């Protein structure tokens, strides 16, 4: 979409895009409508032969947002100053709020991944997924359920999970095929 929008915007901002020869009575690549008079909330952008090309407020907002945020490095300083939002704009307030919340999201613990799973025609089970991320190492995921942990606590000789393979050995396709055949 980012790659197509500049082409789309350049076609929209041309002097006149005439689609009336097909009989559609639309302008601006179909976003505007050719009418005798524009409604109160619409703006006249260009002419459609003898009529006006009227564009609704959503299209005007779309164009302004693209010019404001999509092409800041292309426009000169005068145009950028004209398109800057007001200081109390809701978009600026939302952006500041999102940026202030990001550190809190990153600092959440791994217990945030605990889910309650309900399977139809079965008993509900509490499932926790723990992932470890260390640069340069393979990530292993351990999943436990209530029934698994209860059984392992009750048994005196609870076996430990199998040791992960060493990180230096990479599996080859032939080894993967042999393992699949064994299972």
From Swiss-Prot:
Keyword Signal attributed: yes
Disordered as annotated region, ranges: 141-183
Keywords assigned: Antibiotic, Antimicrobial, Defensin, Disulfide bond, Secreted, Signal
One Gene Ontology cellular component annotation held by this UniProt entry: extracellular region
Gene Ontology BP term (one): defense response to bacterium
Major location category of this protein: secreted
Signal peptide coordinates: 1-19
Source superkingdom: Eukaryota
Amino acid composition bias (Pro residues), ranges on this chain: 161-170
Subcellular localization: Secreted
Disulfide bonds listed in the record: 27-53, 34-48, 38-54
Record family assignment: Belongs to the beta-defensin family.
Function (record text): Has antibacterial activity.
Protein name from the UniProt record: Beta-defensin 129
Species name: Gorilla gorilla gorilla
Underlying gene: DEFB129
């Amino acid at each position: 979409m980012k790659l197509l929008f500049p082409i789309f915007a350049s076609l929209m901002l041309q002097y006149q895009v005439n689609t009336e020869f097909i009989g559609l009575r639309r302008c601006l690549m179909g976003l505007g409508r050719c009418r005798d008079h524009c409604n109160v909330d619409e703006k006249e952008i260009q002419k459609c032969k003898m009529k006006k090309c009227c564009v609704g407020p959503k299209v005007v907002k779309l164009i302004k947002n693209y010019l404001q945020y999509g092409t800041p490095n292309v426009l000169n300083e005068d145009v950028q100053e004209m398109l800057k939002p007001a200081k109390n704009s809701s978009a600026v307030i939302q952006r500041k709020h999102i940026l202030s919340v990001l550190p809190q999201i990153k600092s959440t613990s791994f217990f945030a991944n605990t889910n309650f799973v309900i399977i139809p025609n079965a008993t509900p089970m509490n499932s926790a997924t723990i992932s470890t991320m260390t640069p340069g190492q393979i990530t292993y995921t351990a999943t436990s359920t209530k029934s698994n942990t209860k059984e392992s606590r009750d048994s005196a000789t609870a076996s430990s999970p199998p040791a992960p393979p060493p990180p230096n050995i990479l599996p080859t396709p032939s080894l993967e095929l042999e393992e699949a055949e064994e299972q």
